[in-house]
């Protein structure tokens, strides 16, 4: 039996951890190009 709630929490946590640096990188990249 698969526990979808745990998988969902792990996926959302991973997305947050990956999205944080990604957003900062994109913002810095855009400011640098402008």
From Swiss-Prot:
Locations listed in the record: Plastid, Chloroplast thylakoid membrane
Record's keyword annotation contains Glycosyltransferase: no
GO cellular component: chloroplast thylakoid membrane; photosystem II
Coiled coil spans: none
Principal location class: plastid
InterPro entries to which the protein is assigned, alphabetical: PSII_Ycf12_core-subunit
Gene Ontology process terms (BP): photosynthesis
Swiss-Prot/TrEMBL keywords: Chloroplast, Membrane, Photosynthesis, Photosystem II, Plastid, Thylakoid, Transmembrane, Transmembrane helix
Membrane topology: Single-pass membrane protein
Keyword Ligase: no
Membrane-spanning residues: 6-26
Role: A core subunit of photosystem II (PSII), probably helps stabilize the reaction center.
Family: Belongs to the Psb30/Ycf12 family.
Subunit structure: PSII is composed of 1 copy each of membrane proteins PsbA, PsbB, PsbC, PsbD, PsbE, PsbF, PsbH, PsbI, PsbJ, PsbK, PsbL, PsbM, PsbT, PsbX, PsbY, PsbZ, Psb30/Ycf12, peripheral proteins of the oxygen-evolving complex and a large number of cofactors. It forms dimeric complexes.
HAMAP family, per database record: PSII_Psb30_Ycf12
Name of the protein in its database record: Photosystem II reaction center protein Psb30
Organism: Heterosigma akashiwo (strain NIES-293 / 8280G21-1)
Lineage of producing organism: Eukaryota, Sar, Stramenopiles, Ochrophyta, Raphidophyceae
Protein's gene: psb30
């Amino acid at each position: 039996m698969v526990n979808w709630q745990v998988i969902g929490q792990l996926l959302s946590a991973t997305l947050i951890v990956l999205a944080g640096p990604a957003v900062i990188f994109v913002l810095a990249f855009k400011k640098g190009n402008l």
